[in-house]
Amino acid sequence: MHYRFLRDSFVGRVTYHLSKHKYFAHPEEAKDYIVPEKYLADYKPTLADDTSINFEKEEIDNQGEPNSSQSSSSNNTIVDNNNNNDNDVDGDKIVVTWDGDDDPENPQNWPTLQKAFFIFQISFLTTSVYMGSAVYTPGIEELMHDFGIGRVVATLPLTLFVIGYGVGPLVFSPMSENAIFGRTSIYIITLFLFVILQIPTALVNNIAGLCILRFLGGFFASPCLATGGASVADVVKFWNLPVGLAAWSLGAVCGPSFGPFFGSILTVKASWRWTFWFMCIISGFSFVMLCFTLPETFGKTLLYRKAKRLRAITGNDRITSEGEVENSKMTSHELIIDTLWRPLEITVMEPVVLLINIYIAMVYSILYLFFEVFPIYFVGVKHFTLVELGTTYMSIVIGIVIAAFIYIPVIRQKFTKPILRQEQVFPEVFIPIAIVGGILLTSGLFIFGWSANRTTHWVGPLFGAATTASGAFLIFQTLFNFMGASFKPHYIASVFASNDLFRSVIASVFPLFGAPLFDNLATPEYPVAWGSSVLGFITLVMIAIPVLFYLNGPKLRARSKYAN
């Protein structure tokens, strides 16, 4: 682990301030540091500095550089611009930038192993809290007995957890984009609260209290899911971003399936309450590890801190940072608009976002519906034990991993290499893979439903579930990348916040009616066939959505006031 990981971690920052900058000092605070002339109090801007950064006219990414997706926007091409802007004198202010294109303090210049370790940490964090969504579901029967409630009510804690991490991004995503807060402090503080909440959740003695605690747990679990992709983008070059996001999202997509796997073992060996003690332990371990090893990577926050250090060293109050300039111009009204209204406006008014939200919400809901459907067949028909039922969820993980190993080399061939060859690459490059994912998703649902009968081997439904999961992974990856490449940087946070809220609300209600849907459509020979077929026909129709984007993507983006 590199020294800067500890220096810029939560513990490192606290130690730095408590020791009055004696420990974990930064390069600018070294005795032999030579302050660049432009930061000195008596520095006079020359004609060469006249082309200053215009914060209102030019979108700047979180590394303090012109945003790649904003450049060359006239031809709707995805391009990259990693050139540092050396023109950093803005009127009477001196805007702090990186010390050259190869500044080692810039996370995008970290060595590959350090980037990989950072992405692993974000993925582990996501997995350690995200498995909490369905971790207790193997113990629902025991929960129903203890609290004297029905199945639908016993499913409410799952529903409210999912709603919680749909609402959370409306609060935490804007905070993580503010230079004062950054990403790491939000990760650590919310993770600490999540860990603490697992204690009363494990001890609560009524369903109302359990539901409230589960909602709060989901709310404080949301930053890693909502901001994890942005953290990956902090350290990964633009042309490698789809690969980095795929690596991180393995934890996000596989996490809910790990929950029932461990939950089934704990329920059999102890009780449903121990599923929450397990969450306390695993997320607590994650908290301790990340306190020491998770560095800040948000460029605006790092430059904000650098500006503060340079002001202290030089006594020059003209020194500022991009983040400080943005905060000084942000009004309370603008903050409310960006945080609460714009995600809703974009969802309703943008056809591209609305259609993607509907499709992804459906796919997301199907994955959560498996937590209700698997017991109907594997326990009710094949008489699996609870632990054996837990292992069946690993078929979802296997399907996702296989899809990732196929997706990464394909996307490198179709996206990364053309960009490195300086060829034009359009957002629609992701869509053919999404169409393939849609076909796999639909095929998997039909395979799962019609192979799950009383006479065939149970491996058939597992193959169908794995195929469904593979398709879901491809749809998630490609449509998220398509949205990220299609909209202006200023609106990306609102676009994804709307998606988080929309898909979480829709997915949260599916487990409530999942079992009744399959029970009402069941036949003696095929207990889940017709229920799966209903979902299969719906997803078959929805394949038209990526096909529409592939045929008319540029036209749809041209009509949008938010798109590139």
From Swiss-Prot:
Return the Low complexity bias intervals: 67-86
| Result of changing residue 317 to A | Leads to general drug-sensitivity
Induction of its expression: Constitutive, high-level transcription is commonly observed in laboratory and clinical strains of Candida albicans that are resistant to the antifungal drug fluconazole. Multiple cis-acting sequences within the promoter mediate its activation. One, a benomyl response element (BRE), is situated at position -296 to -260. It is required for benomyl-dependent MDR1 up-regulation and is also necessary for constitutive high expression of MDR1. A second element, termed H(2)O(2) response element (HRE), is situated at position -561 to -520.
Q: Which residues are glycosylated?
A: 453
What's the effect of swapping residue 296 to A? Answer: Leads to general drug-sensitivity
Q: Where in the cell is it found?
A: Cell membrane
Q: What is the effect of changing residue 300 to A?
A: Leads to general drug-sensitivity
Q: Name one GO cellular component term.
A: plasma membrane
For the Cytoplasmic compartment, the record's topological domain ranges are 1-115, 173-183, 228-242, 295-350, 412-428, 477-503, 550-564
Q: What is the top-level taxon of the source organism? A: Eukaryota
* Pfam families assigned to the protein according to its UniProt record, in alphabetical order: MFS_1
Q: Does the keyword Transmembrane helix apply?
A: yes
Topological domains, Extracellular: 137-151, 205-206, 264-273, 372-390, 450-455, 525-528
GO BP annotations of the record are: cellular response to oxidative stress; fluconazole transport; response to antibiotic; response to cycloheximide; response to xenobiotic stimulus; xenobiotic detoxification by transmembrane export across the plasma membrane
The reply to whether Lipid biosynthesis figures as a keyword in the UniProt entry is: no
Q: What happens when the gene is disrupted?
A: Leads to enhanced susceptibility against fluconazole, methotrexate, 4-nitroquinoline-N-oxide, and cycloheximide.
GO MF annotation: an example: fluconazole transmembrane transporter activity
Q: What does this protein do?
A: Plasma membrane multidrug efflux pump that confers resistance to numerous chemicals including azoles such as fluconazole, voriconazole, and benztriazoles, as well as to benomyl, cycloheximide, methotrexate, 4-nitroquinoline-N-oxide, sulfometuron methyl, cerulenin, and brefeldin A.
Record text about domains = The central cytoplasmic loop (residues 295 to 350) is critical for the function, but unlike other homologous proteins, has no apparent role in imparting substrate specificity or in the recruitment of the transporter protein.
Q: What else is known?
A: The overexpression of MDR1 is a frequent cause of resistance to the widely used antimycotic agent fluconazole and other toxic compounds in the pathogenic yeast Candida albicans.
What does the similarity note say?
Belongs to the major facilitator superfamily. CAR1 family.
Q: What is this protein called?
A: Multidrug resistance protein 1
